[in-house]
């Protein structure tokens, strides 16, 4: 599609659109028309669409760095989901006159918002960023020394120390010498020879006295429970610790597979009270495993009981049985009774039950 021609000269390609005049103008005609008077120089103008070059630009796509009209913006950014995520801003109109000497590129940056494209010709800002990054990489001044010894942090420099007296130098060497790069955590036994050598090399013996002592791991853990399954008839015994209880469980019951009764568990001693007694009677005996003869006797008794069982037919609901016998039947099935039949049935069967006050049971 051919580009849109200028509405003024009708020969050159239109480069911008004047909104107050509603006219497409080329660069030369724009400079002539809008430089005529002060009122014309205030006209807001926008660039042409960079895709179709037929309509004025409406938005600026920051991802594509292109000014687009409404139609091209809809067609391009609805093609796929990735294009829909492009950030777009409205076109900012400009009021300066545009010269036709090849400065269109520079003016295009002005019509696009400078806050979004500040790094196009920003050599100064790039230099500032490089200087800021280099400031983080600068090494500290060798004349300035920061030391930390025995909890004291001090900064000494050549400019801050007035004079070079031997007394001051001696004090600095005595107070602010180089610290040991490793911390002494005082774990385990330390060789006295190595320790004295480190203290002499550091030169900080007179600043803060360090008490070297051996940290011993406690051998007895509090709140511990000892389970003794080695056997024997010993009960629960007090282990001697503050909160440590030693449990000794008899394993004779575990060997035969029978749960012991309450008498097999002995007393437990507690530090804050008297001995805890079991709920069972201490005079009761433990369960003894059955012998083969006793087991055979039990099996025989069970078999005798099973043989002597009686399966007799008993009438559980006598009243229901009597009522079922009174109801009329047709071919063995119950039939509906009419009023006359009901009266006849009552009269006919009245003599049978006349001598009984209750429903008979069979």
From Swiss-Prot:
CDD domains recorded: Bbox1_BBX-like
Locations listed in the record: Nucleus
GO cellular component: nucleus
Binding site for Zn(2+) 2: 49, 52, 72, 77
Ligand binding (Zn(2+) 1): 6, 9, 29, 34
GO molecular function annotation: zinc ion binding
Major location category of this protein: nucleus
Positions of the CCT domain: 295-337
ZnF B box-type span: 6-48, 49-91
Example of a GO biological process term: regulation of flower development
Keywords per UniProt: Metal-binding, Nucleus, Repeat, Zinc, Zinc-finger
Keyword Repressor included in the entry's annotation: no
SMART domains the record matches: BBOX
Sequence similarity: Belongs to the CONSTANS family.
Protein name, per record: Zinc finger protein CONSTANS-LIKE 4
Source organism (scientific name): Arabidopsis thaliana
């Amino acid at each position: 599609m051919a580009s849109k021609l200028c509405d003024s000269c009708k020969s050159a390609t239109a480069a911008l659109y004047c909104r107050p005049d509603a006219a497409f103008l080329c660069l030369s005609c724009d400079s002539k028309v809008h430089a005529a008077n002060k009122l014309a120089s205030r006209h807001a103008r926008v660039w042409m669409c960079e895709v179709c070059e037929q309509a004025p630009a409406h938005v600026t796509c920051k991802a594509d760095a292109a000014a687009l009209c409404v139609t091209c913006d809809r067609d391009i950014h609805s093609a796929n989901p990735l294009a829909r995520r492009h950030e777009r801003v409205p076109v900012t109109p400009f009021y300066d006159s545009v010269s036709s000497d090849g400065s269109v590129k520079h003016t295009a940056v002005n019509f696009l918002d400078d806050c979004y494209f500040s790094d196009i010709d920003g050599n100064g800002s790039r230099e500032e960023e490089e200087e800021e990054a280099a400031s983080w990489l600068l090494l500290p001044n060798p004349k300035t020394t920061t030391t930390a010894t025995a909890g004291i942090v001090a900064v000494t420099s050549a400019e801050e120390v007035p004079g070079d007296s031997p007394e001051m130098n001696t004090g600095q060497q005595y107070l602010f010498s180089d610290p040991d790069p490793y911390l002494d955590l005082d774990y385990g036994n330390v060789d006295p020879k190595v320790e004295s050598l480190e203290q002499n090399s550091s030169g900080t013996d007179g600043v803060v006295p360090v008490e070297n002592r051996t940290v011993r791991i406690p051998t007895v853990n509090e709140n511990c429970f000892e389970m003794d399954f080695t056997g024997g008839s010993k009960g629960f015994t007090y282990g001697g610790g503050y909160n440590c209880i030693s449990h000794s469980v008899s394993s004779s019951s575990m060997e035969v597979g029978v749960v012991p009764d309450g008498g097999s568990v002995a007393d437990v001693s507690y530090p804050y009270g008297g001995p805890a007694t079991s709920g069972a009677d201490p005079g009761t005996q433990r369960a003894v495993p059955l012998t083969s003869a006793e087991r055979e006797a039990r099996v025989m008794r069970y078999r005798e009981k099973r043989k002597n069982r009686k399966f007799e037919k008993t009438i559980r609901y006598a009243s229901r049985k009597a009522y079922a016998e009174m109801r009329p039947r047709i071919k063995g099935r119950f039939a509906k009774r009419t009023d006359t039949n009901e009266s006849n049935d009552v009269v006919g069967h009245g003599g049978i039950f006349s001598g009984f006050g209750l429903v008979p049971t069979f």
